[in-house]
Structure formats: C-alpha cells, structure tokens
C-alpha cells in the first residue's frame, strides 16, 4: 500500500489581527495559545524580581500537531472548535469561561482648543499636598486676576473641513484598518497692522458764518464768570494762577476765607453790590449824625469858664478826648468817599467794584463803630451824675445869643 500524502503545513505566523479584532484560527491548539494573551507574572513578591521580563516567542508546532490540524480543516464537523477563516465569526471561543465579540475600533479625535489657550500639562497641574497638604494655603486665591486684554484681529484663511475616516469592507466581510485622510494644513496667520492716521481737517464753515478768533479762546478759563457757571466744571489751579484771575473767581475756596467769598459774591452781582453800598452808606451816615454834634458840643465845653460851670470843668480831660475822637472819625468817613468821588470824575468807573477799596471801607466802618461805642462810654462816665436841669443849663450856654 502506498503511504498517504503528507499535507502541506499551513502558515503559522499570522494567527491574529489585533487591530481589526478578528482571529484567524488554524487549529485548536493555536486558538488556545492566542486566547491566553495575558502575560503571567513570573516574579516574587515585587515586580522588581521578575525572572523573564520579555515574552518568549511561541514554539513551532510539532509534525504530529500539524497533521491533526490539517485533518481538522478538511473535516470541520469532527472538531467543532475549529472555524473557517473565510466566514467572519460572530463569537469566537478563547477560553472555557466566556466568549469575545469582535469590536470595530474607531479613532478618537479631540475637539480643538480655542486660540490662545494652551493644553494643560498633567504633570504640572497635579496637586502638591504631601502629608499636610490639606492645611496648605492655596496661593492662587490671593492672586489678583488681571483683566483680559482685547485680542488683536487676526486674518485667517478658511481651512478645509475635517474628513471622517472611511471604513472599507472587503467582499469577504472582514473589516480592515480605517483609512484616515489628513486635513490640509492651514497657512500661517498674519496679524493685521493698524492703518496710519492722518490729521483730519475741519469741515469748511457754511457761507455767512465767521470762524471764532483765537483771542476769544484765551478766555476759556474765565467761563466761571458767566451766568451759567454752575453747569460748567470747576478747574483746579495753583495759588499763582488764582491770584492772577479776576476778583469774582468762585473756584478759590481753599485759599480764601468765607468773608472773602461773600465779598466776591456781593461784587459779582450788580443788585447785591448796590445793596451793599447802600448798607455801608446808611451806617456811615448814622455815625456822622452822632459825631458831628458831639464835636460841636465838646468844642464849646472846652472853652467854658470853670467858675460858672464847675461840672464841665471837672471833666476837661474827657471833653478833650471826645473832641479828638470826633475829628478822627469824621475824617475817616469823609476822606475815602471824597477820594472815590475824585477817581470817578477822572474816569475810573470801576472803583466801587474793587475788592481792596471795598475792604478798606468795611474796615473803616468797623473802626468808626468801635469809636462810637467808646464815645458813649466816656459820656456816660463823665456826665451820669448831672441832673437834667444842669445838662439843659449847660446846653443853653451854647446859644450865642445868651
């Protein structure tokens, strides 16, 4: 008898396709070898003492096993564990405990980050706590966040849309590796440069309208003297600039007294200024009505004989003091008004609106009022003990007909 022909050994290198998830089984022994893919730990207590750190290649099948596998391919019913390679199996046994279904792998794509945002580094972002990390203070809490600066416009060109991977299935039903088309790289972005600015010329004025001269613009600091000064913002100037400005400057609040402000307000308005001068005039008129008769009486008392008028002769010193006070007060009142009248006749018409003149008049008025009070006190001290008859008798002595 002729010996049977030896079957041709099938290729043993290509047993599995790990990326596609399909097993091409050739024999039962090879399927068991493929199923046990987990490397066994051949070490001691720690992984540092492993004996074999690299996996050994699978041993080649013996000729007896090759003969059995060839028979199993010819008659699949004899060995139900074998599966034909042409048919894509739904479930492939790899162990006695369960089965594994083939899974199609899909490439994972991450969403692109917005411009200006960096991808977080997992090594740097790890919390550094240590043993007492719970009690450590977070340094980022006290850091003040600066406002984000507005992004400069960037000229970008449209990029090609992303192409999803296409899956190609062969006619046999076994999926292959997904084919991914790479998107076209975008051109480098070029930042926009600001356009140069040129001085803008003013629009021409309509016919019949004159341009404002530059001389009027110089008086922009004195807008506070206008009627609508309350609506305009007040300007802060130094002391030298305030002294150079007009009398009615209402912005100089910190450097002048309240009385100065009141005087400035009085002089600024015509009605209040006239009312103020009327008050000053009436007060000085009353002072003159007191001191003019007093001067005449004291002038007569000084010349009376001591034998006939012993009461008057006893107060000679007081009479002389009152006579001098009366002359001084009348001169203080008369000279300023006479001077103002002369200046008005010479052409200086703003004397009544001058702040120094106004201050001088008010100081003289207060001084004359104090002399008035002093004169009243001296008269009461000198002639309080005289009765009305003696006073009347002394006054009759002033009559030149007697």
From Swiss-Prot:
It is a multi-pass membrane protein. The keyword Transmembrane helix applies. Residues 30-39, 49-67, 135-148 have a biased composition (Basic and acidic residues). Keywords: Cell membrane, Membrane, Transmembrane, Transmembrane helix. One of its GO terms (cellular component) is plasma membrane. It is found in: Cell membrane. The keyword Membrane applies. Residues 1-10 have a biased composition (Pro residues). Residues 1-213 are annotated as: Disordered. Coiled coil: none annotated. The chain crosses the membrane at residues 279-299, 325-345, 360-380. Its main location: membrane. Residues 158-185 have a biased composition (Low complexity). This is Uncharacterized protein MG144 homolog. It comes from Mycoplasma pneumoniae (strain ATCC 29342 / M129 / Subtype 1) (Mycoplasmoides pneumoniae).
């Amino acid at each position: 008898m002729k010996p049977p022909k030896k079957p041709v050994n099938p290729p043993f290198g290509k047993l599995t396709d790990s990326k596609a998830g399909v097993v091409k089984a050739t024999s039962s022994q090879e399927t068991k070898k493929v199923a046990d893919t987990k490397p066994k730990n051949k070490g001691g207590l720690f992984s540092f003492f492993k004996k074999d750190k690299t996996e050994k290649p699978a041993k080649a099948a013996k000729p007896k096993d090759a003969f059995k596998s060839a028979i199993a391919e010819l008659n699949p019913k004899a060995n139900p564990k074998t599966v034909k390679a042409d048919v894509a199996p739904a479930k492939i046994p790899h162990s006695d405990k369960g089965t594994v279904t083939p899974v199609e792998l899909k490439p994972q794509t991450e969403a692109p980050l917005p411009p200006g945002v960096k991808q977080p580094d997992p090594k740097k972002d790890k919390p550094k706590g240590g043993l007492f990390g719970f009690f450590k203070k977070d340094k980022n809490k006290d850091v003040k966040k600066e406002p984000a600066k507005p992004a400069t416009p960037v000229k970008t060109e449209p990029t090609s849309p992303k192409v999803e991977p296409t899956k190609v299935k062969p006619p046999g039903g076994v999926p292959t590796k997904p084919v991914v088309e790479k998107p076209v790289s975008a051109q480098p972005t070029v930042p926009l440069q600001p356009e140069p600015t040129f001085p803008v010329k003013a629009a021409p004025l309509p016919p019949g309208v004159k341009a404002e001269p530059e001389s009027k613009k110089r008086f922009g600091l004195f807008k506070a003297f206008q009627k609508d000064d309350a609506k305009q913002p007040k300007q802060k100037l130094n002391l030298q600039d305030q002294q150079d400005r007009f009398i009615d400057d209402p912005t100089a609040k910190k450097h002048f007294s309240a009385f100065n402000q009141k005087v400035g307000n009085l002089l600024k308005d015509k009605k209040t200024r006239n009312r103020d001068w009327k008050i000053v005039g009436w007060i000085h008129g009353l002072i003159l009505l007191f001191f003019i008769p007093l001067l005449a009486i004291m002038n007569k008392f000084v010349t009376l004989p001591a034998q006939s008028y012993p009461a008057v002769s006893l107060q000679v010193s007081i009479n002389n003091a009152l006579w001098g006070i009366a002359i001084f007060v009348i001169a203080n009142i008369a000279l300023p008004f006479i001077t103002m009248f002369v200046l008005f006749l010479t052409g200086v018409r703003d004397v009544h609106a001058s702040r120094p003149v106004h201050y001088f008049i008010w100081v003289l008025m207060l001084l004359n009022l104090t002399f008035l009070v002093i004169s009243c006190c001296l008269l009461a001290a000198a002639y309080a003990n005289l009765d009305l008859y003696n006073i009347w008798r002394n006054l009759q002595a002033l009559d030149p007909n007697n």
